[in-house]
Amino acid sequence: MSKEIDWRKSVVYQIYPKSFNDTTGNGIGDINGIIEKLDYIKLLGVDYIWLTPVYESPMNDNGYDISNYLEINEDFGTMDDFEKLIKVAHQKDLKVMLDIVINHTSTEHEWFKEARKSKDNPYRDYYFFRSSEDGPPTNWHSKFGGNAWKYDSETDGYYLHLFDVSQADLNWDNPEVRQSLYRIVNHWIDFGVDGFRFDVINLISKGEFKDSDKIGKEFYTDGPRVHEFLHELNRQTFGNTDMMTIGEMSSTTIENCIKYTQPERQELNSVFNFHHLKVDYVDGEKWTNAKLDFHKLKEILMQWQRGIYDGGGWNAIFWCNHDQPRVVSRFGDDTSEEMRIQSAKMLAIALHMLQGTPYIYQGEEIGMTDPHFTSIAQYRDVESINAYHQLLSEGHAEADVLAILGQKSRDNSRTPMQWSDDVNAGFTAGKPWIDISENYHQVNVRQALQNKESIFYTYQKLIQLRHTHDIITYGDIVPRFMDHDHLFVYERHYKNQQWLVIANFSASAVDLPEGLAREGCVVIQTGTVENNTISGFGAIVIETNA
């Protein structure tokens, strides 16, 4: 078993198994592929690996549509493989976090199959079925496009799906549903996993089923019984363990996230929120093409840092995951090799000096970029394909639609991990399930490890700093120069220590503002700071005299 780790000082490495490492040649990553690369992950220095879902699934939403919570998808391997992964990871002092989806199941799940058999079936109340003679019961929108209700002709009723039509929402108001889910969570605890990431967990409590003058999310986001349900989940499953738990929170608030994570409330350890990753949306709409609103990014990051700190909660900090574009393409610059490397290092430093638990998404540590696909045929993500057809139907030109997908598609982060400059980036001996980014000859793990100045070693150093300096984990945060057009500046204070963080989000050199005391020891740096000027995409952390 791995050594005890203070989860607040821990760093998590997210693995998207389908795109990580294929050992069978079928073009799909697998569990044995993860085992094969554990030494690499250990070298990076993280404490946990988080696997996106590996359960049985028809894969309409790449595993987030679970048809059997207690079996491993054969594409990824076997239960024996998963057991071996946990054993080998623990031998290397790595903990394993499972992604679990308990807001909805696949429509291929046995519960849903039973529910469709008749209106009197006991599993009918596991889901939200409603009769309606006038079309869908409400005008709520699915997050994947279209109405959130699907007509089922088998029993002449509509069922709720906040996501894809193949993902039916579970009725948490039904105690039998909750107990069934708690048994599943306890099964995996007994199996030996060390933590859980709960998908869209703040949507589990639905309120009134009324028409909305918006898209309906006000009726189910942070719903009326959500804190009651999470407290019960905690008490009946992981609450008496040292497991790390994190909830993915959709369109939530600071106030609710404090409640979700205050230790005395006994709900979750920490939360993901995504407000800082909507700063390139136009009027809150994802499927638009927009530049980074830098002032808004700083404002949101600091609101959440201060709010969670003051409220005694705990937040995750991250730039990337399996649902987001690659940050170096999004907020940095991938147009040249020099700019890619420099901006990736700057973004890493800017984020990892914040309070919270850092999550590093596979490939982020080597500066992987968006793939810049040029055809809809290259996309695999159901949300992106739906958006493509929706935008075309609204009259947008195809070139404009592809440009939007190129900026916002979830497939940007789902291209295979680039291990080397060998065929297929060393990911597979077969045909990969999705195209590999064409820059793998320059951007790959092999090259990163050979160059001590690479992005990889910046991430490694940042992880080491978090493990060894309490100021990063426990210190207060003070924003500085929030009105500056290019610099992200903040201080960290803890006991008699004070650190100053300066990050230049511009490709050009920037003069440092007056009043910015910079005397002290350099903790970590990328780029240069000379003659009161910081280089393009430069960043520096200085331990100053408090």
What are these regions (language model features)?
Residues 1-56, 83, 87-89, 353, ...:
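Carbohydrate-interacting/catalytic domains
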Residues 188-198, 315:
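Active-site regions of oxyanion-processing enzymes, predominantly non-cytosolic
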Residues 97-98, 197-200, 246, 318-319, ...:
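Generic enzyme active-site microenvironment
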Residues 45, 65, 192-194, 318, ...:
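Short loop/turn motifs at secondary-structure junctions
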Residues 168-174, 327-341, 442-453:
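Active-site rim elements
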Residues 107-143, 230, 234-416:
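Conserved alpha/beta catalytic core and glycan-binding cleft of carbohydrate-active enzymes
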Residues 219-223, 287-294, 337, 448, ...:
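Hydrophobic alpha-helical scaffolding
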Residues 2-186, 190, 203-255, 259-263, ...:
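Acidic/aromatic-lined carbohydrate-recognition and catalytic surfaces
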